[in-house]
Structures are given as C-alpha cells and as structure tokens.
C-alpha cells in the first residue's frame, strides 16, 4: 500500500510515492486496509485541509435536523421550515419522520411513567424536546438535572400559592411532586389555556402587554425572594469566568479579544448599580401564554435565578432577533417592538436610568454567552448566528439607547 504526497513546482504536479508500511504504525495500516488496499491515497498537507472536517460536517447536520424537529414541534409548518433551511418540503418531512423515530422509545417511557399519577389513560403527544401533552389537561416534563427540576418545583409552588397564573403541580399517587426512573425525573402540571404568540410584530397592544406581564412577574418574584433561597448568578462573573475561558480555549475564533475586554470594562463600570433579584432567565414567546389576546400564564422556571433584572428584558428582545426568520421581523419592526415592550414594562415597574444605559452592554454580553455556549455544544451555525446578533446590537447601540430613553414618554 502506498500513500501519495503531492506538491506543485512551477505549475507541474510532482508526486512522491511512499510505502505506508515504512511510515505508519502497523495497527494504523491494518485499520486503513479495512477501507482500501492496493491503491494510492492522497493525504493533503495539514494547513490545506478544509476547516470543516467530514466529522464536523456530520455534526452540523445532526444539529440542523434537531433544530428542524424542535421548530416543527413549536408549530412551524414544513413549507416555512423548507424556506428557512433552504431544503425541499420532502426533505423536511423525511428529517421530521427520522427525528420522530428517535423519540419513540421516549414516548413509550412516558406512557409507562404516567401510571405514577392517578389520572385516566390519555393520549401522549410530544410538544417540545422535553415536554409531552397528556390528553387535553396535563403537561409532563422530563429532566436529567435534579437541581433544575427542584428549582422549577419550588418556584411553581410559591407562585401558585400567591395566585400567579402558572400550571399547578399534580402530585403522584404517593403524594410526591415528581416521579423518577433510572434515567429521568418527571413532573406533571395542569395545562394552561392559551398558546404562544407568533405574530407579535403585527400587534403593538400585545407587545405592550408582554412588557406589563414581565413587569408583574418581576414584582411577584421580588416578593417571593424572602420565602426561600435561590440560585445566585452574575452575568459579569460569567463573562470573566467560563465565557472567557471558552474563547481563550478556541483562540478567540469568533470574538475579537479587544472587543470582549472593552465590553467587560463598560459592564463593570455600571454593574453594581443594576438591581438584582429573582428573574425568569428564559423569557421568550414560548414561555408566556396568551388566550384570545389576553395573558393566560407563565411556564418553565427551570433556569430561574437571582441576577440583574434587565437580563430578562434584554434576553426577550434578543430572542426575537434569533427567531427573525420564523417571526418575519425586520430591523425596523424590532426597534418598534423594543419601544412598546419597554414602555409596557415601565407602566408597571420603573427602570433605573443606569439600567437603561446598560441595556446594549447586557444584550451584547448575552450574545457572547450564547456564542460560547454553542461553541461548547459544537453547534457552529448557532454560534455564528449569535455573533451576528451581537454585531447588530453593537452597530445600533445609539438607536437602542435613544428608543429606551424615549419609551417612558411614548
């Protein structure tokens, strides 16, 4: 077996043939012989190898297909998905069918674990990666992280006791708040009426209401803090901690180091002046339900923590940019939503001048968080998308500040 080493000299291709047995370990030669024997193999020069190896490409396809399936569960049509991912409708259908097969074993587990609750046999329908609708009245959610499970249970219980609109926990036959097997933890809650909004940019009243709803949740959270201990977190500490470590480990692949340090410096100057309290931490349209234009309930407190209050506001607005293809939101419409959303929030709960001034910095820091997180997940496409959102906010800092400053006068 030979390996071909090829290089160019004055336009001519010079080929050096070398016996693989003289270069490679016997075990490696035997491994290669399982794929090819008696033929020449070209091994490219290392620095000319494409950045994306076949393995990385396959990982990208896996991530893409997972995203497609998740969005289909969220109600995005096959034709919309085909346009978003530049695939044919038949390809989208094939991907969804394949992904659904992968969840069949989990569906069977759900049907079994439901016996832990004293409810009638119901149809099981997957509605999210980790959530199943049970009949018309319940939602079952799965967890691998018991801390995340207990955090959600704690907050749901406190909010329900205060009359806040959340899906109440249904106790098991043994009067426990959750069930478990060898792999997962399960929590069953009453299903709230309503659904998430998909056309938020077409209704400024709903946008304003969304701001009010978040403000009311923050007020309730503030009152809840005295009833128990909650996870303390800090966006600034994350920036100086694991986020920076990921960027250093990856040689600042997407992020300019000086831009990162400059953002941290600006954030540090104002951070101690920003109010800290219990926040939702995952504010997006899927977690706030509306029924015929009226707010009907909050869901999913898995990530709730004590952090800067404006994190939730910034996170929500950034989420609209990350879903712009689904929601069909232009930059101009996003700025309009920003105005009504902050105006609605401040009708219920005033923001400090320092909070408003920090909004662009917090938005940019959140996107750096997502770039780092997606890099750790080997999700290159989402990491690049997060970087684009950061660049959009950084480019439009003055516009963001101007709109927020004027929102109270709107």
Predicted regions mapped to residue ranges:
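ATP-binding pocket architecture of kinase catalytic cores
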Residues: 135-225
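Short, small-residue-biased leader/transition segments that mark boundaries at the very start
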Residues: 1-3
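Short, amphipathic alpha-helical "recognition" segments used to contact nucleic acids or chromatin
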Residues: 59-76
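A cross-family kinase active-site recognition segment
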Residues: 201-254, 276
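Active-site acidic catalytic loop and adjacent metal/ATP-binding pocket
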Residues: 128-136, 140, 169, 265-311
């Amino acid at each position: 077996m030979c390996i071909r080493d090829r290089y160019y000299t004055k336009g001519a291709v010079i080929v050096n043939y070398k016996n693989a047995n003289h270069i490679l370990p016997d075990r490696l030669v035997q491994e290669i012989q399982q794929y090819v024997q008696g033929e020449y193999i070209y091994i490219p020069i290392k620095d000319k190898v494409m950045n994306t190896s076949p393995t990385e490409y396959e990982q990208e396809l896996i991530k893409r297909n997972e995203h497609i399936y998740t969005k289909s569960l969220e109600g995005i049509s096959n034709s919309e998905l085909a346009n978003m991912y530049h695939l044919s409708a038949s390809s989208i259908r094939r991907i969804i069918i394949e992904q659904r097969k992968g969840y069949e074993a989990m569906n069977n587990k759900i049907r079994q674990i439901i016996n832990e609750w004293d409810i009638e046999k119901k149809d099981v329908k997957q509605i999210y990666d980790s959530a199943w609708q049970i009949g018309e009245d319940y939602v079952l959610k799965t967890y691998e992280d018991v801390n995340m499970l207990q955090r959600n249970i704690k907050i749901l219980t406190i909010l329900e006791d205060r009359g806040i609109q959340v899906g109440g926990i249904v106790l098991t036959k043994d009067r426990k708040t959750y069930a478990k097997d060898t792999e997962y933890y399960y929590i069953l809650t009453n299903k709230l009426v309503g659904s998430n909004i998909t056309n938020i940019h077409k209704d400024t009243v709903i946008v304003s209401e969304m701001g009010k709803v978040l403000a009311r949740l923050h007020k309730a959270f503030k009152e809840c803090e005295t009833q128990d201990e909650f996870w303390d977190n800090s966006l600034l500490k994350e920036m100086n901690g694991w986020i920076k470590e990921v960027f250093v480990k990856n040689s600042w692949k997407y992020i300019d180091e000086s831009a990162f340090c400059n953002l941290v410096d600006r954030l540090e100057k104002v951070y101690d002046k920003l109010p800290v309290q219990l926040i939702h931490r995952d504010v997006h349209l899927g977690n706030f339900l509306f029924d015929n234009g009226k707010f009907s309930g909050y869901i999913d407190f898995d990530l709730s923590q004590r952090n800067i209050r404006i994190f939730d506001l910034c996170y929500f607005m950034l989420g609209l940019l990350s879903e712009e293809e689904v929601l069909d939101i232009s930059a101009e419409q996003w700025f309009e939503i920003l105005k009504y959303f902050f105006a609605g929030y401040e009708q219920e709960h005033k923001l400090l001048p320092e909070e408003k001034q920090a909004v662009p910095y917090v938005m940019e820091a959140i996107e750096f968080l997502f770039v780092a997180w997606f890099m750790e997940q080997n999700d290159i496409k989402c990491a690049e998308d997060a970087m684009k959102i950061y660049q959009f906010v950084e480019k439009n800092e003055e516009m963001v500040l101007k709109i927020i400053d004027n929102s109270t006068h709107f």
